[in-house]
C-alpha cells in the first residue's frame, strides 16, 4: 500500500481502514513513511473516513445513545477562546452532548485545558461518562484515554514534526459515534472533504464550517458551511447578520485560565460583547443542526435564554459530578 501512496494513487475507504490497522502494528520507520507519503499526496474524503472509522472501531467502546459533538480541527493559529466547548456547555441545556477532545493543538486552550480550568475532571471512566450524560446531559471524552491503538503512532507523529492526517481526525474519531456534529475546519479546502467523510461515517445531521481562517463560525467575516443531512450535502455561506447580530472582532486568548475566565463571564451573562457573539453564533448553528432551532436567529435566542444563573448552576453540577 505504501508504493501506491508514493505513486500518488488514492486509497479506497476500505484500504484506508486497513491501513490504520496496519499502522498500529508497524515499525516506527514504516509508520513515518506512510504518514509522510500520505501527507505529501494529500488525502481524500474516503481516506479521512476510513481512518476515522478505524479509530472509532479500535477505541474503547462508549454507548451513550444519540449525542451531539461540537469540535474543531484546531490549527488555525488564531489563539481564540475555546468556543466549541463553551457552546457544548450551553447546548447541554437542550440535548445530550458528548464532547470529544484533547489538550491544545495550536490554540492556547484546547477543550481539555478549558474544562480543567473550569474545575471539571476530564479523566473519567466510560461508566462515569454514561452517568454524566444521563444526569447532566454533558460528558467529556478525553481522547488519550479512549484510543489505545494510537500508542505506537502518536510518538512517531510527534517526532516527524509535520502535519499528518491525524491533525484533522480528532472531530471524526469520537468513540460515542455522535448522530449530530458541528465540525470546524482550519482550511476551506477541508470543508467538502470533511462533509463527505461524515457522510461515509453515517452521521444523521452535521455542519462543517470554516470562518475566514477560523475553525469556527466567524463573528466578523463570512463563513463557509457544508450542511450534511442524511446523505445530502448543501453548501452555502453565512455572515453574522444571518444570526441577527452585528459583526464583532475576535479577541486573542493567551492561556486556559484566561479562556475559562472569559467563557465563565459569557455564561454568567456579563462577558465581553465580542466573546458573547462568538459563542452565541456557534451555539446557534449547533441548535439549528440538531433541529431544535428552526433558523439561525432562533438559535441565538435559545442560546441566550440559558445564559446567567441557570447555566452557571449547570456548570457547577457538571464539575461536582465529574469528581464524585
Curated annotation (Swiss-Prot):
InterPro entries: Anthranilate_Pribosyl_Tfrase (IPR005940), Glycosyl_Trfase_fam3 (IPR000312), Glycosyl_Trfase_fam3_N_dom (IPR017459), Glycosyl_Trfase_fam3_N_dom_sf (IPR036320), Nuc_phospho_transferase (IPR035902)
Documented EC number(s): 2.4.2.18
Cofactor note: Binds 2 magnesium ions per monomer.
Official protein name in the record: Anthranilate phosphoribosyltransferase
Binding site for anthranilate 1: 72, 102
Entry similarity comment: Belongs to the anthranilate phosphoribosyltransferase family.
Domain of life (superkingdom): Archaea
Catalysed reactions, as listed in the record: N-(5-phospho-beta-D-ribosyl)anthranilate + diphosphate = 5-phospho-alpha-D-ribose 1-diphosphate + anthranilate
UniProt GO MF annotations: anthranilate phosphoribosyltransferase activity; magnesium ion binding
Binding-site residues for 5-phospho-alpha-D-ribose 1-diphosphate, renumbered to this chain: 72, 75-76, 80, 82-85, 99-107, 111
Functional note: Catalyzes the transfer of the phosphoribosyl group of 5-phosphorylribose-1-pyrophosphate (PRPP) to anthranilate to yield N-(5'-phosphoribosyl)-anthranilate (PRA).
Entry binding sites for Mg(2+) 2: 215-216
Gene: trpD
Binding site for anthranilate 2: 157
Chain sites annotated for binding Mg(2+) 1: 84, 216
